[in-house]
């Protein structure tokens, strides 16, 4: 399944506009906020451009976790039973690029990351959490747009083995 990801070009424009406005009003604070924002799960990226660059360099698909890290019970359970386990971390390092797309209620997320996450949520039609999509990205540099080659999606699974087996089936298709 291939999705044309035209909203990313809007996101990239919005990102540069937000950075410019924030930099003008807050000095370098905008860059500091962005630099200090990290994923809830160690080792996960939060920026689609960084995930794309690493995916392109390694040839690995991106595995995006749409989560509500501070309020979603099933998201917390998935983190505890799968993402926090050494077995998963070892598997992920060999097989995927990890991208966390968080929709917290009590944690402050920079505006550019909020916009990125909302655009990706719309592009993948995510309506519940946790939702994990596995995909490849291609970028048209001239148009500054991504094309998504979706490999599959999953939600909560109780064990590392069950989770990784499911994702491996998506990757092999």
Task: Report each predicted region and the residues it spans.
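Typically the conserved alpha-helix immediately C-terminal to a functionally engaged Cys/Sec
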Residues: 75-91
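C-terminal segment of classical bacterial N-terminal signal peptides
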Residues: 12-20
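Short active-site neighborhood of thiol/selenol oxidoreductases, capturing the structured segment around
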Residues: 58-72
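The canonical Cys-X-X-Cys-His
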Residues: 72-76, 132
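Non-catalytic, surface beta->alpha helical segment in thiol-disulfide oxidoreductase systems
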Residues: 122-173
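Thiol-based oxidoreductase modules, predominantly thioredoxin-like and allied folds used
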Residues: 42-45, 88-115
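N-terminal "domain-start" segment that seeds a small globular fold
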Residues: 24-52
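A short beta-strand-turn-helix
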Residues: 44-62, 92
């Amino acid at each position: 399944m291939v999705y044309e990801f035209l909203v990313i070009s809007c996101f990239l424009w919005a990102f540069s506009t937000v950075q410019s406005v924030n930099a003008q009003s807050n000095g370098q604070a905008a860059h500091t906020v962005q630099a200090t924002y990290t994923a809830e799960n160690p080792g996960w990226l939060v920026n689609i451009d960084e995930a794309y660059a690493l995916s392109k360099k390694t040839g690995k698909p991106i595995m995006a976790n749409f989560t509500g890290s501070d309020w979603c019970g099933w998201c917390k359970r998935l983190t505890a039973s799968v993402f926090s386990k050494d077995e998963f971390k070892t598997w992920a390092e060999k097989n995927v690029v990890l991208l966390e797309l968080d929709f917290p209620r009590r944690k402050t997320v920079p505006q550019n990351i909020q916009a990125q996450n909302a655009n990706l949520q719309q592009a993948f039609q995510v309506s519940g959490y946790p939702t994990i999509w596995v995909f490849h990205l291609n970028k048209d540099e001239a148009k500054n747009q991504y094309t998504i080659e979706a490999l599959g999606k999953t939600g909560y699974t109780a064990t590392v083995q069950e989770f990784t087996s499911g994702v491996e089936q998506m990757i092999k298709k």
